[in-house]
Amino acid sequence: MTFVASVELSLFRFEIDGLGLPPHGAVGVGNIVAKKGSRMPAQRWAIRIETDDGARGEYVTHWVGTPSSFAQATMLAPHLLGCDPDRREEIWQDLRREVRAYDHMGHGPLDIALWDLAGKRRNVSVTRLLGGFKTRLPTYASSYHGQEESGGLDTPRAFADYAAACRARGFAGFKIHGWHNGDAAREAATVLAVRKAVGDGWPLMLDPASQLRTWRDALYVGEACDEACFFWYEDPYRDTGGAVEGHKRLRERLRTPLLVCEHVRGLEAKAAFVLGGGGDLIHADPEYDMGITGAMKIANFCQALGLDLQYHACGPAHRAVMAATPNTHFYEMALIGPDMPNSVPPVYACAYSDQPQDLGSDGCVSVPDGPGLGVEVDLEKLAKFTVK
C-alpha cells in the first residue's frame, strides 16, 4: 500500500502593487483599498504531500490563506501520515471530526492537495477524475469593496463606470461588494446606478457582505435589486448569513433570488438552511467547505433538489469542481477593481491566471487539463517568499 510519508506546510508573504489598507490598518479581505504607488503586504500558505513512492500533491491557498486556517492545517497535517492517500473519503471524515470545535477552514487545502496527488499519480486531471465536462467557464467580475478614501470604488458612479468597463471587456456579469458602514441608501443607489450604466439584460449581482445593519435595511436594498432585475442578492445583513427565518422572510418579499451559505460550513448545515426555506441558490467553496470532497457533496445535494449552486471565489480547485458541476452559472474572478489587481498569490510557473487582463475574448477562463490540478507552482519563487 502506498502511504503518506510527509506533509509540508509553508507560510509565505508577497506584495501587491496599487493596493493598501485603510487608516486603521486592519488586515482583511474587505479592507483592501486602491492606493496608487503603494505595495500591500499579503500572506498565504502552501501544502505539499509526498508519498513513500515519491509522488507529490500540492496546493497554494487563495482566499482561505489566513493565519488561523494555517494553524488549523498544522493541527490536522499529522493525521495524514501513514494514510493511504486514495482513501480520501475516510480521511475527510476523520479530519472533519478532528476540527469539529472550530470553523473547518484549515481542512479544505489538505483535501485539495490529496486530489492533486491522485491526479498526478494517474497522470490525469482532477477535472477528469471528477467526470468534468466543461473546458471554458463563463466568468463574472467580482469587485473590491467600496472605499471611503478617494480612489478605486469610492462612489456609486465609480462602481457604475467600472461595471460598464467590465461589460466592454467581455465579462459575463458583475458583482458589487458595497461599503462597510451599512448605508442602505448608498447601497441601493449603487445598485440602480450600475444597472443604468450597463443597460438591461446583463447579469448583475450584489453582495453587501453582511454589512447592512438590519433586516429592514436588507429588504430596502433587496427592493432596489428587484427594480434593477439583479441575478442574485447575497448575504445582505448582520446575521452574517446564518438566520434561516430572516432569509425566509426576505424571500417572501423579494423577487431577486437569494444566494446563501457562504459562511455556513459543510453539507449538513447548508442542507438544513435551504430545506428550512432560507435561500434559492447555495454557495460552496472547495477551500472553505472542506475541500473538493466537501464541495462536490454540496453540489450533488443541490442537484438532487433541482437547485443551482455557485462556487465562491477563484482558484484551480474551483475551476475543477465547476467543470464537473452542471447546475452552476459563473466563475467568480474575485476580487478586482479599477487599477486594482486580484490579490491571489503570484506563484504559478504556467499560464494560469485570475487577473482581469487574462480573461478570454469569449468572457471565459480555461479549465486546466494537466495532471492533478493542472497548474505548475514556481517552487523557486515560493521558496523566496516563504517565511515559515
Label every model-predicted segment:
Residues 1-58, 62, 346-350:
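Structured beta-strand/loop patches that form or line metal/cofactor-binding pockets in enzymes
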Residues 10, 50-122:
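Metal- or metallocofactor-binding catalytic centers and their adjacent structured scaffolds
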Residues 27, 78, 223, 229, ...:
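Shared catalytic-loop signature of beta/alpha-barrel
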Residues 54, 76, 110, 123, ...:
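Conserved, mostly hydrophobic/aromatic
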Residues 59, 139-142, 172-176, 204-208, ...:
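Hydrophobic faces of well-ordered beta-strands that scaffold small-molecule active sites
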Residues 105, 111-151:
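Glycine-rich, aromatic-flanked loop segments that form ligand/cofactor-binding clefts
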Residues 136-254:
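Metal-dependent enolase-superfamily TIM-barrel catalytic cores that perform enediolate-based chemistry
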Residues 369-388:
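Extended hydrophobic packing segments that form well-structured cores
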